[in-house]
Amino acid sequence: MAIRCEKFVVSGIVQGVGFRYHTSHQGLKLNLVGYAKNLYNGDVEVIACGEPPKIEEFAKWLEQGPKTARVDELKREEITCREYQGFEIL
């Protein structure tokens, strides 16, 4: 199956609530690679690469996030795949 990479930008109460940790855990659980990092404006940027059905499942999870977060908006776009090791928290 082809590998797809997507960039997600998650807005809401997503910093200081363990969002990146839970996102990394969920990504690894779905056999995805990539990263989650805080942005200066309070959003979280997530890059995820893997099988398309797993990316879709991950996107559905990101729409809700962990119980400690409040996701107001999720933007996504397909990007060129790069080599990532694991699912990092940056």
UniProtKB/Swiss-Prot annotation:
Keyword set, alphabetical order: Hydrolase
PROSITE patterns cross-referenced by the UniProt entry: ACYLPHOSPHATASE_1 (PS00150), ACYLPHOSPHATASE_2 (PS00151), ACYLPHOSPHATASE_3 (PS51160)
Catalytic activity: an acyl phosphate + H2O = a carboxylate + phosphate + H(+)
EC id: 3.6.1.7
Domain Acylphosphatase-like per the UniProt entry, residue ranges: 5-90
Family, as annotated: Belongs to the acylphosphatase family.
Domain of life: Bacteria
SUPFAM superfamilies on file: Acylphosphatase/BLUF domain-like
Organism: Vibrio vulnificus (strain YJ016)
TM stretches of this protein: none
GO molecular function, one term: acylphosphatase activity
InterPro entries xref list: Acylphosphatase, Acylphosphatase-like_dom, Acylphosphatase-like_dom_sf, Acylphosphatase_CS
UniProt-annotated catalytic positions: 20, 38
Lineage: Bacteria, Pseudomonadati, Pseudomonadota, Gammaproteobacteria, Vibrionales
Protein name: Acylphosphatase
